[in-house]
Amino acid sequence: MSDFSEELKGPVTDDEEVETSVLSGAGMHFPWLQTYVETVAIGGKRRKDFAQTTSACLSFIQEALLKHQWQQAAEYMYSYFQTLEDSDSYKRQAAPEIIWKLGSEILFYHPKSNMESFNTFANRMKNIGVMNYLKISLQHALYLLHHGMLKDAKRNLSEAETWRHGENTSSREILINLIQAYKGLLQYYTWSEKKMELSKLDKDDYAYNAVAQDVFNHSWKTSANISALIKIPGVWDPFVKSYVEMLEFYGDRDGAQEVLTNYAYDEKFPSNPNAHIYLYNFLKRQKAPRSKLISVLKILYQIVPSHKLMLEFHTLLRKSEKEEHRKLGLEVLFGVLDFAGCTKNITAWKYLAKYLKNILMGNHLAWVQEEWNSRKNWWPGFHFSYFWAKSDWKEDTALACEKAFVAGLLLGKGCRYFRYILKQDHQILGKKIKRMKRSVKKYSIVNPRL
């Protein structure tokens, strides 16, 4: 593997043997394919044009990566290093980043690659592509984190944090903030461990004060590293969660709420469902008024109508005294069950079955018809076919009963799903099925008496 990285220092001269191959200490084999790659056979002619051969080599690498042929990709990669000598200045400047992205992907998945190989490659690429130093350092740190090497990752980030080269640009500033924030995440991890250690100590324990001070020191470092990043528009979920957890731990609930509110509602930030989830969970922990919880989940509903929190949203709406909220509660349940991933959600079907009956008993037929009109052409096949009746009854009789009740209320007693469940002989559910039959007869929206 050391030979793989050594190629980054310069191209091989023309008089080298084309048959030469390299077998690194790590056990990765890299035959020299210069002649093969430089020769693109078309009609028996040989093309030696530099741009054409490097382009062909790049195509070979990409194809090998797509097919997960890591050894073959590594062999082509060995030849692709010649792009560092491209006469086109634009391509020559772009080459280090391309080589880093391709090479790191190969080394990450190659079965004979190891930590030493990746580290050597990363360090060489940082020095060759100085304009990409920060980006490569960050990605290198993430690789180390993936392998559980927290100390090495932290050292890598600290070195990158103090690196100075070239002009200060907005993109460079964001990268530095990102590097500092990931360093903050590592400090947060240490803080979490210290906090756990503190929770196991009695306040009268002689070590308590020392550990408590250690916890505070780590939280201060983490806050300093993360706070700058989360003010920049972007999706910073792990950083926001860590920062808020520490603010809550030290009793700064107002500060935590301000961070989460800005993250969710600042128009400069991209739309992010998690931002509203974090804010909702925080307000819920603080026992915020129902109206606040509803306002947060209402936005989440507009972004992800199938989210699991929509069932909580329905419960909040159902308990509200406002008629518009109770009407929205019905819309939310229908919205959840519009999605294929929710078709087996028995809680959603239970809520809908019970809520439909209550709404119809309360003379709000128009609410149901409004939701059903846009679904009556596809819900019967999507939810209430004969096939689903047999399948649901076989897999989950409780689910089948809830769905059958909804089917009966929406489609009447002639619905095939409803009729199939009605005919089943089940000792435990027998009484429930009889009650369901009476309710459908009385409240179904296809019943003329309504």
Swiss-Prot record:
GO terms of molecular function: DNA binding
Stored InterPro entries: RNA_pol_I_TAF1A/TAFI48_chr, SL1/TIF-IB_Component, TAF1A
Cell location: Nucleus, Nucleolus
Gene Ontology biological process terms in this record: transcription by RNA polymerase I; transcription by RNA polymerase II
CC terms in the record's Gene Ontology section: microtubule cytoskeleton; nucleoplasm; RNA polymerase transcription factor SL1 complex
UniProtKB keywords: DNA-binding, Nucleus, Transcription, Transcription regulation
Pfam families: TAF1_subA
Transmembrane regions listed in the UniProt entry: none
Subunit structure: Component of the transcription factor SL1/TIF-IB complex, composed of TBP and at least TAF1A, TAF1B, TAF1C and TAF1D. In the complex interacts directly with TBP, TAF1A and TAF1B. Interaction of the SL1/TIF-IB subunits with TBP excludes interaction of TBP with the transcription factor IID (TFIID) subunits. Interacts with UBFT. Interacts with CEBPA (isoform 1 and isoform 4). Part of Pol I pre-initiation complex (PIC), in which Pol I core assembles with RRN3 and promoter-bound UTBF and SL1/TIF-IB complex.
Chain's role: Component of the transcription factor SL1/TIF-IB complex, which is involved in the assembly of the PIC (pre-initiation complex) during RNA polymerase I-dependent transcription. The rate of PIC formation probably is primarily dependent on the rate of association of SL1/TIF-IB with the rDNA promoter. SL1/TIF-IB is involved in stabilization of nucleolar transcription factor 1/UBTF on rDNA. Formation of SL1/TIF-IB excludes the association of TBP with TFIID subunits.
Name of this chain's protein: TATA box-binding protein-associated factor RNA polymerase I subunit A
Organism the protein comes from: Homo sapiens (Human)
